[in-house]
Amino acid sequence: LSTLEFDYVILDESQAIKNPSSKVTRAAQLLQAKHRLCMSGTPLQNNTFDVYAQMNFLNPGMLGSVEFFRQEFSVPIDKLGEPDRKEHLRKILYPFILRRTKEQVAKDLPEKQEIVLFCEMEKEQRDIYEAYRNDYRNQILGSIENQGIQRSQLAILQGLMKLRQICDSPAILNEKEEFPNYSIKLDELARQLKEDISDHKALVFSQFLGMLALIRSKLEELGIPYVYFDGSTSAPDREKAIQQFQKQESIRVFLISLKAGGVGLNLTAADYVYIMDPWWNPAVEQQAIDRTHRIGQTKNIFAYRMICKDSIEDKILKLQERKKALAKDIISDDTGFVKNLTREDVEYLFS
């Protein structure tokens, strides 16, 4: 394809080229075209740097080299929070961005309510959580003291992941010691599916395959018909699951891996959405919720983010708000998240 000259090259879901050094980004840059267009619902997912490769595809060199952009914009905006740098970048990008929100292009869409559903861990689950939190807090702060925060990123990531898994259920921890399935979230989800929304269809998203497996077992125990897919599901099986959920009244629940089901799906048969393990990237969760809140939907949508009170999930909500503000101001992967944490952030998250 690189030998052909096109009139137009259009990249749909252009956030796929946000990494300038990835193979897909380098391949896209080889395409020859008189006109180029990027389309994305989430051009900025993790940090300011996400927009660099997309803009470099559209207007090569406009934002300078990778290192120039990092020093002039990425570091000052993401790490130092400098408003003048953010405003300067916004002005540069403004002539090349046409932003249309769903509210502007689909004004007849029904109402969508997003609700944080706080769950209080029972004593058994809380005791396991606190034991791991104390252990990782001491390990990580000791590592930061001895090696600095940059060299402690792997330990931070591991600690965050373990605490998140315990918030779902300690049973999904990949440890030598096996823990029972203490899960207040699973109990609450089962109660809602059985009692509160027995006449409705729901999408249930989780980032953890272990949690999805626990939910599958619970649905089978309750006799609730469901369909399922994750990243390993073949394209034909995925399409079959979608059609069954959309067309068969008896199938009430669609279980989906968050990474596998965040984009490219139209699931308007559902009017309830559950994000089992919300995390730091609100854009990913928003895309998941919007699998059902889209053109063709006739019912009001209720989206629940399930959060364990007084946990790592609870604390991360405040960091999410910062990321939403960043995307809004400029556009008017876990590792990237950890790179932006300060020692004070780490102490807060593990406190």
For the regions a language model picked out, list residue spans one by one.
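ASCE P-loop NTPase motor core, strongest for the SF2 helicase catalytic module
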Residues: L1-G81, R90-S351
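Long, charge-dense, solvent-exposed interaction surfaces that engage phosphate-rich ligands
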Residues: K86-H88
